[in-house]
Amino acid sequence: MKFWRKYTQQEMDEKITESLEKTLNYDNTKTIGIPGTKLDDTVFYDDHSFVKHSPYLRTFIQNPNHIGCHTYDKADILFGGTFDIERELIQLLAIDVLNGNDEEFDGYVTQGGTEANIQAMWVYRNYFKKERKAKHEEIAIITSADTHYSAYKGSDLLNIDIIKVPVDFYSRKIQENTLDSIVKEAKEIGKKYFIVISNMGTTMFGSVDDPDLYANIFDKYNLEYKIHVDGAFGGFIYPIDNKECKTDFSNKNVSSITLDGHKMLQAPYGTGIFVSRKNLIHNTLTKEATYIENLDVTLSGSRSGSNAVAIWMVLASYGPYGWMEKINKLRNRTKWLCKQLNDMRIKYYKEDSMNIVTIEEQYVNKEIAEKYFLVPEVHNPTNNWYKIVVMEHVELDILNSLVYDLRKFNKEHLKAM
């Protein structure tokens, strides 16, 4: 590990205190030229002892503005201290979590996974138009049918056609011959440049796509492409202690990755992350942002520096081995659940190394779905699946209660058939 290590509470406090001392403090400076200030102290008062002992809350109240991308542009006169935390965080994620080589990466903390995915699509659309002189109608987004709806938001906002690739009902995998025929047809109608959204843990199934499947077929047809991996759910679990992982930066075909701190990492909402290889993010530079010292290449404008600090603190609290232990605990709970489902001969889908179990609809009645807040694939009578997500709060006692109800329902259900 190059950047990721476990910190004590005192070490974290000292590091963040030092960062805040290098960050603009509106109380002790004559700052009158920017439209910003600290949080309103009639509501966000900082004189409680618990605030003084919380590096995150002190950062939140000091209110650093992390506008821009600080791995790309090193301007840091106003908020340089917490900028440094975000820079370190991006390199930690790219190299120590996502298995990048000893190189630099670009990235920033977004408002969520949706923004990170749209940032990627924006970067690659502009890359193809600027670097390859592509016509707008020659560019397409391509992704699996199980992909998060943010891909469709990006398609709409960027006015790029999107191609949806069907998946097998049971394996949730893209079939090579299906993808081949779809790409061939797209080429025949004039598509030459492809933005791939490849999944590392889909929202409904936790399924993982093979980026190399896309790469091999595009290479076969001599087509240009950029692969973005949506790891909003799977990014903090699937690559951990997983030698089979092909969806990270160890794969030369992967250009960028989305992560989301507010899911597996249990960070506050607003802690998505976009990480990319160098020499890509400059394609979204907004030259008109002339009054900003930083070069503005991000979809977000102003954003809270406390979100970057929150993500860094969670990772630093555990360290790589503490995090591995936590992830393996959730995997073991998931394996226990799957064993019970196997014993009951209930059909389900689960991706290796993931903590989502998706059960076929026929084995779940309305009462069970409502009692455990099981999420359907669609909220209408055509629904085929319900999902279970084994998060930190989902202990074996809860899973055992679910198993009891499933066993009771399916025993009665089978008798009636």
Curated annotation (Swiss-Prot):
Transmembrane segments: none annotated. One of its GO terms (molecular function) is pyridoxal phosphate binding. Catalyzes the decarboxylation of tryptophan to tryptamine. Tryptamine is a neurotransmitter that induces the release of serotonin, which is suggested to modulate gastrointestinal motility. Therefore, the tryptophan decarboxylase from the gut bacteria Clostridium sporogenes (strain ATCC 15579) may influence host brain and behavior. Has weak activity with tyrosine. Activity against phenylalanine is undetectable. Its main location: cytoplasm. This is Tryptophan decarboxylase. Inhibited by (S)-alpha-fluoromethyltryptophan. InterPro entries: GrpII_AminoAcid_Decarb, PyrdxlP-dep_de-COase, PyrdxlP-dep_Trfase, PyrdxlP-dep_Trfase_major. Keywords: Cytoplasm, Decarboxylase, Lyase, Pyridoxal phosphate. The keyword Lyase applies. The modification N6-(pyridoxal phosphate)lysine is found at K263. One of its GO terms (cellular component) is cytoplasm. The keyword Mitochondrion does not apply. Its cofactor is pyridoxal 5'-phosphate. It is found in: Cytoplasm. It catalyses: L-tryptophan + H(+) = tryptamine + CO2. Its EC number is 4.1.1.105. GO terms for biological process: L-tryptophan metabolic process. Belongs to the group II decarboxylase family.
